[in-house]
Amino acid sequence: MTDIKRPFSNPLALAILVLLYERPMHPYEMATTLRERGKEKSIKLNYGSLYTVIEQLLRANFIAVREVLKEGKRPEKTVYELRAAGEVELIDWMRELISSPVKEYPMYEAALSLLPVLPPEEVIDLLEIRIGLLDKTVEEIDEQDRICREMKLPRLFSLESEYYKGVTLAELKFTKDLLSDIRRDAGGLRTGWTEMRKHLLSIKAEARTKETAMAAIRKTQKKKGKP
C-alpha cells in the first residue's frame, strides 16, 4: 500500500490532465469527450465538479488558460492547456496508481463491518437480492463486451470493463460463500452473530431506560421549580 500524499486524489483531476495531455480543451469539450469515450462509467462526472477541479488544477499551476474564445453572442469559452508541472504530475500519478495498491473504502465493506445491527435472517434475504443484482451486472458487462468484439475495438479500450467484471465476479463469489456460511452457521458465524446482536440490543435498551429515567427526573425537578 502506498502512503504518498498527492495534491489531488480525485479521478476527475486525473482525467482532465489526460485530456489536456492530448490537446488544449475548454470544459464543455472535456465533458463531451469523456462521455463519448464512456469514461463516466469509471469516473464520476458532472459539470459542477468539473469546473471546481479545473479551478483547483489552475491554483496548483498544473494547467493554464491558453485562450478565451468569443463567437458572436455565445458565452465565452476558456481553453485550458497542460503545463510542464502538470505533465510531470500526470505521469508520476499514473505510475503510482498502476504500481501501488491503495486502501479503498467501499460501502459494502463498511456495511459488512457493522452487520450486528441487522438480524441474520434479514441479511440472508438481502444477500440473495445482492446476488441477483450482481448476476445481472455480469450479464450487462458480457453484453457490452460482445458489442465491443463485434465492433472489433482494440482490447485496450475494454480493460476497465474487464477489471470491473473481475471485481464483480470476486464480490459475487464472496457474497455467495458468505450466504452459504450464514445458512449453515459455518465456524459459528450465525450463532456468534445472534449473541452479538442480543448484546447490542441489550445495551441499546439499557441506554433508553436510563434516558427515560433521567427525563422523568428532569420533569419532576421542573415541576418543583428546581434547576
Residue positions per predicted region:
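Amphipathic alpha-helical dimerization/coiled-coil segments
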Residues: 91-139
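Basic helix-turn-helix/winged-helix DNA-binding cores
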Residues: 1-103
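Acidic interhelical loop/turn segments
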Residues: 142-163
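Amphipathic alpha-helical coiled-coil segments and their boundaries
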Residues: 120, 127, 154-157, 161, ...
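Extended, low-aromatic, Leu/Ala- and acidic/polar-enriched alpha-helical coiled-coil segments
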Residues: 161-169, 200-207
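Long amphipathic alpha-helical coiled-coil segments
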Residues: 182-197, 225
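Non-transmembrane amphipathic alpha-helical segments
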Residues: 127, 134-148, 168, 175
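Short, contiguous alpha-helical
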Residues: 165-185
